[in-house]
Amino acid sequence: MTLDVFTKVVSQADSRGEFLSNEQLDALANVVKEGNKRLDVVNRITSNASAIVTNAARALFEEQPQLIAPGGNAYTNRRMAACLRDMEIILRYVTYAILAGDASVLDDRCLNGLRETYQALGTPGSSVAVGVQKMKDAAVGIANDPNGITKGDCSQLISEVASYFDRAAAAVG
């Protein structure tokens, strides 16, 4: 995303044989500033990924104990591990989308076909969607913490972060 913006602006100026204008420089400075916010958010989510996944799974299983009861979709250590792995993969691809500012990496490499896979395995997509929403709540809370991050209004970025989780929940639910 950032490289494309810089390349486009420089190419346009070069094709006209001009220096970059003050407006163009200001716009590029804003891209860098916004990029720092994205990096802060991704770093926070990544640093807390294990807790986000574990706590979301714990809350899901408290709400839906049938999942971990004998015969449940997360019963046995192997199935539980698969559940946690899938939640971690979804979270990882959400961070890629946040960094890129684009959901296509999330869609193309993670979500496309995931619902069908879960249906074929008999995994309740609605339960996975609840788990994703719980990860969203935790990740947004962590990303919204104003301590130690780039200052400025992050409401649009936080809304974007939430939208990637909503997209993932809708894809599996």
Swiss-Prot record:
GO biological processes: photosynthesis
Pfam families in UniProt: Phycobilisome
Post-translational modification: Contains two covalently linked bilin chromophores.
Positions that bind (2R,3E)-phycocyanobilin 1: C83
Residues annotated to bind (2R,3E)-phycocyanobilin 2: C154
Family: Belongs to the phycobiliprotein family.
Function: Light-harvesting photosynthetic bile pigment-protein from the phycobiliprotein complex (phycobilisome, PBS). Phycocyanin is the major phycobiliprotein in the PBS rod.
Subunit composition and interactions: Heterodimer of an alpha and a beta subunit. Part of 2 PBS rod complexes, the conventional PBS rod and a photosystem I-specific CpcL-PBS rod.
Protein name (record): C-phycocyanin beta subunit
The species this protein was found in: Nostoc sp. (strain PCC 7120 / SAG 25.82 / UTEX 2576)
